[in-house]
């Protein structure tokens, strides 16, 4: 037990994670220590970690880093320049101009545009999604993919291994292969070896011909387009990139794909064959990996909060915070920044929702304004600040996204779509009820007790 305590105290874990593990180990020293070893040694993921490391190094030289663009950004906004420098150093991610960004305020609008763009594909289609479920949405997309295969377009589909326990059969990848689609399962679940929840591919990426890319919270299942109802109205968001910035998503996909077959052929898919797009602002697509000690997703969010002067508006389905993120939210509000958070009115998971409410009192006391979307569930992951910067992607405000999953997002500075993002937030706000100390007191006792108990193990959720 002493060895376990020494390991925890000297680890790079955040304070709450260390406390959580101590609460597990102290009353149950043998079982707790074995569980710690099981989760931290990653026996089922050592090969994956090695492959990810190799593919990450292999792909870095292909990121086209234009120093001139960076200098222009420095001249217009030094603080955003500093963040761009960080993203380049942490993952090699370049900053782009000449990239048009279109914002979608719901799954329905994204779905319609996806189909239009898929039908235009001439060379390749790459899809990487956390959830794919058979139904109207996936059925229509699959029909287009089959058509494109017949036309000679290379189609690749990759989905997370957890789907084999939920929405897709174990042989689904083989079924796709039979119709000419190259298919991969990322990190299949291995009983008693996989930790199940860790190292999941939570990313959502669609790339077409290195010309167009989609990113955001919307998976390929019918609830995301409100074709079926789950937890009321499903509020989600996405962005479409056209132009130079698409290359980063092409490379992100190829990097993850290569972990399953060590195929490091990247250059043929990076041909710049699109008409030059003139667009305002700067775009930085980026990803985050749980296999290093760099919390890229969280660091970007915290930077937005720390640099904000007027407002930060946030949409997130979950709110399970480490001390750094909680402090950043509080400090921004205490500095006079208008911090607003919209969360679900109807949660998809009751325990995490009860846990989120344990963070509400301290945030409210600091001046953070919290709202719940009354028509249903908010699955969007959006930050927008001061009319000049925003992030749309897959990164939730919880430990799973910030520490344990593979994620991706699009950082935007002074792009034209910021107007649409802010307008959508305000429209969503009109459909939301404000949370106050008074409303929290009216919560069910069971909800309060669940949140109180579960907060002790928040980092494990």
Curated annotation (Swiss-Prot):
Pfam families: PLDc, PLDc_2
Recorded GO CC terms: plasma membrane
Membrane-traversing stretches: 18-38, 124-144
Cell compartment(s), UniProt: Cell membrane
Protein's UniProt keywords contain Transmembrane helix: yes
GO molecular-function term, one example from the UniProt record: cardiolipin synthase activity
A biological process term (GO) from this entry: cardiolipin biosynthetic process
InterPro entries assigned to the protein according to its UniProt record, in alphabetical order: Cardiolipin_synthase, PLD-like_dom, PLipase_D/transphosphatidylase
PLD phosphodiesterase domain ranges (all copies): 197-224, 374-401
Key words, A-Z: Cell membrane, Membrane, Repeat, Transferase, Transmembrane, Transmembrane helix
Topology versus the membrane: Multi-pass membrane protein
Family (UniProt): Belongs to the phospholipase D family. Cardiolipin synthase subfamily.
Classification via PANTHER family: CARDIOLIPIN SYNTHASE (PTHR21248), PHOSPHOLIPASE D (PTHR21248:SF22)
Protein's UniProt name: Uncharacterized protein SMU_988
Protein source organism: Streptococcus mutans serotype c (strain ATCC 700610 / UA159)
């Amino acid at each position: 037990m002493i060895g376990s305590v020494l390991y925890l105290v000297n680890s790079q874990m955040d304070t709450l994670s260390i406390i959580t593990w101590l609460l597990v180990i102290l009353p149950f020293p043998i079982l707790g220590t074995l569980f710690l070893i099981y989760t931290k040694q990653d026996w089922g993921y050592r090969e994956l970690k090695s492959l990810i490391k190799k593919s990450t190094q292999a792909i870095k030289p292909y990121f086209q880093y234009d120093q001139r663009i960076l200098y222009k950004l420095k001249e217009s906004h030094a603080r955003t320049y500093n963040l761009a420098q960080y993203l380049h150093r942490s993952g090699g991610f370049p900053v782009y101009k000449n990239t048009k960004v279109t914002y979608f305020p719901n799954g329905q609008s994204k779905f319609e545009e996806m189909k239009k763009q898929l039908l235009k594909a001439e060379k390749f289609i790459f899809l990487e999604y956390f959830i794919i479920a058979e139904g109207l949405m996936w059925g229509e997309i699959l029909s287009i993919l089959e058509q494109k295969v017949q036309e000679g377009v290379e189609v690749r589909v990759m989905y997370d291994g957890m789907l084999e326990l939920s929405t897709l059969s174990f042989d689904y990848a083989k079924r796709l292969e039979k119709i000419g689609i190259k298919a991969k399962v990322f990190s299949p679940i291995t009983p008693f070896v996989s930790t199940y929840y860790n190292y999941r591919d939570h990313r959502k990426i669609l790339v077409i011909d290195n010309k167009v890319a989609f990113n955001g919270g919307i998976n390929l299942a019918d609830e995301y387009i409100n074709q079926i109802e789950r937890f009321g109205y499903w509020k989600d968001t996405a962005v479409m990139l056209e132009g130079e910035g698409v290359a980063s998503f092409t490379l992100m996909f190829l990097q993850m794909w290569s972990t399953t077959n060590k195929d490091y052929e990247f250059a043929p898919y990076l041909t710049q064959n699109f008409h030059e797009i003139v667009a305002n602002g700067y775009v930085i697509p980026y990803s985050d990996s749980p296999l290093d000690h760099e919390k890229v997703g969280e660091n970007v969010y915290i930077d937005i909060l720390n640099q904000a002067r007027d407002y930060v508006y946030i949409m997130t389905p979950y709110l399970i915070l480490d001390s750094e993120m909680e402090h950043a939210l509080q400090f921004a509000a205490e500095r006079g920044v208008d911090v607003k958070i919209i969360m679900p009115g109807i949660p998809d998971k009751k325990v995490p929702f009860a846990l989120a409410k344990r963070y509400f009192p301290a945030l409210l006391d600091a001046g953070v304004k919290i709202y719940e979307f009354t028509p249903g569930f908010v699955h969007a992951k959006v930050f927008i600040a001061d009319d000049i910067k925003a992030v749309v992607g897959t990164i939730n405000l919880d430990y799973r996204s910030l520490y344990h999953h593979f994620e991706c997002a699009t950082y935007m500075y002074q792009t034209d779509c910021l107007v649409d993002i802010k307008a959508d937030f305000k429209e969503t706000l009109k459909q939301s009820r404000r949370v106050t100390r008074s409303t929290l007191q009216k919560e069910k006792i069971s909800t309060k007790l669940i949140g109180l108990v579960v907060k002790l193990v928040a980092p494990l959720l």
